[in-house]
Amino acid sequence: MLKEYIEKGGQRLRLGYTTGSCAAAAAKAAVLMLFTGQEVRHVRLMTPRGIELILDIGEIRMQKRTGESSSLFSCEDIEGSCKNGKTVNKPPFYSAVSCGVRKDSGDDPDITNGALICATAALSDRPGIRIDGGEGVGRVTKPGLDQPVGSAAINSTPRRMIETAVREAMEAAEACGEYGLEVTISVPRGRELAAQTFNPKLGIRGGISILGTSGIVEPMSDQALLDTIRTEISVRHSEGMTILAAAPGNYGKNFFLEKYDFSIETAVTASNFIYDTVQMASEAGFTRMFFVGHIGKLVKVAGGIKNTHSQYGDHRMEILGQIAEETAGSREAVPLTLKQELSDCVSTDEAIRILKKYSLDKQVLHEMTNRIQLVMEGWTKGKMRVEVIVFSNVFGELGKTAKAEAWISELRYETGRRGGSPAGGEPGSWKQGWEI
């Protein structure tokens, strides 16, 4: 168990390690056993973050070589770069060795926590180290991801970690010479786990991804979630989508399905990172974004708030009160206590009831929706047009901008063109975890 901690929100949270670290450690152990014939129960792995891991190795399986001996011979017999005449094993003791490492996500709510990540190291007639995915590791079917179409969903950093670990193992085992190795990463429950991740939506089929840029899982990492959002945006752009649909979460997608009988399965899940999502969409080359969200989050955007998480402040009622005051003007029917009444509200639905009481709901919500649009477009300095729909779970659709309906028609067409489901289907899924 990794005993490294961070302080976040007044809590002491334990770090974990990524699927990439597990794969690299398993590969290192498998190669050590392949060339030494000795069981390996623990390996050391230095992560890109600079934290050294000592990981337990299990599920060891060895396949013996047939018809060959494991004789020892001198380094002088090898054309290559062995160390000063040391005696080395040739040929290797086994033709293939597989083993596994259990993923430990620390205090992070990760789908893959406890999953067994396996590596099989096998001799090959071709020189070099080749890394591929086996059962339970996804296969890339769409452009725009870290790996090209057809490749195993083992991202760049884990691939480098695996190759480095394999070379370290060969050096430690004094395995000199031109050995070819096939390293296959597999996850026994990967196909089942993948159904609970974003992978099906991203076009990664058949299993989970092997992820991580630092080798370490940081509980509730903002950066990991931002990386996922950026990846989703990149995939949508590569698919040729001209309008990027986005929503803070599944509430928005579910509302859209119920209201318009249309599943925006291509919608990027922005979570609380509204500003970052808008910026990344613009940077990716999108010039149009369609955003649907609950008033509880989007009213904050109307006030210019970039991250809608409560840790950055609430301000919902203050913003609604300001808009109501500016919209109502000097109407006699509106009491001077309106802002205070709104300020006393606990929920936005309660605030809407107050606005309805004074027949201000339509005006205020219309103005709020337009301000959301203006703020989002302002974030891109006019490089991207944004259409918005705001809803409430109690009151339904509260407001939409001028061209929202027209863009919905375009989204229907684009979703149908890419082979999606314009109606029905699951509106979204959860990400694999906050691996960074």
Task: Please report, for each region that a protein language model flagged, where it lies by residue.
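Extended hydrophobic packing segments that form well-structured cores
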Residues: 369-420, 430-436
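Ser/Thr/Pro/Gly-rich low-complexity, intrinsically disordered segments
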Residues: 69, 74-79, 418-428
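Cationic, low-complexity basic patches in intrinsically disordered or flexible, solvent-exposed regions
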Residues: 65, 427, 432
